[in-house]
Amino acid sequence: IRKKVNTAGIFYEKKDDIYYQLTTKIAKPLKDYHNGWIKSNFIYLYCGAKNTKNGKRGMRVLDVGCGRGGDIMKFYHARVESYVGFDPDHHGLYNQGNGAISRYTSNKKKYPDFPDMDFLVADASYLLNYEDQLNGVGKMSDQNKKMLTDIFGENKNKLTNKKYDVLNCQFMLHF
């Protein structure tokens, strides 16, 4: 059976999970502190409903380097209106077991008031428009191309009217 079934995806996912789950006795408390307390407080403080005019949902968030979407519940609890997350790692966004889109779909089913969230493959080292992203990232799906155009515009001279209240970039700069 192994000769007839392509198992490369399974092994890739296992290898990927090992990287993300790698913790040591020294690193675990620091990781928990950073993910649990620091990130939560930043998100609640700067994206929370108290920052809006009416105190209800309202902040529009652009998340640079959203990875696997590990913070989307924090944004839900902060009561954001909408969220756009982008990351150059296609696998981190589309991983069926633990990717950002999978997490979003699961949470949207559980919580009917979960905000609208979009995820796309894009690279922050290039200008955020269709033309530059296509040249920088290269191959991408038609859906991703459409979202790129809808969210950031077709070229650097014609941007969309979409605006964001908060730019979030938690874990991207150290890479």
Task: Show the residue positions of the predicted features.
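Class I SAM-dependent methyltransferase Rossmann-like catalytic core
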Residues: G9-K53
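A short SAM/SAH-binding and catalytic strip from SAM-dependent methyltransferases
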Residues: E154, Y164-F175
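Glycine-rich SAM-binding Motif I of class I
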Residues: G69-M73
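Conserved class I S-adenosyl-L-methionine
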Residues: G58-G67, V84
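Local beta-strand N-terminus motif with an aromatic residue
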Residues: G58, K163-Y164
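Class I SAM-dependent methyltransferase SAM/SAH-binding core
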Residues: Y76-G136
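Short conserved loop adjoining the S-adenosyl-L-methionine
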Residues: Y126-G138, Q143-N161
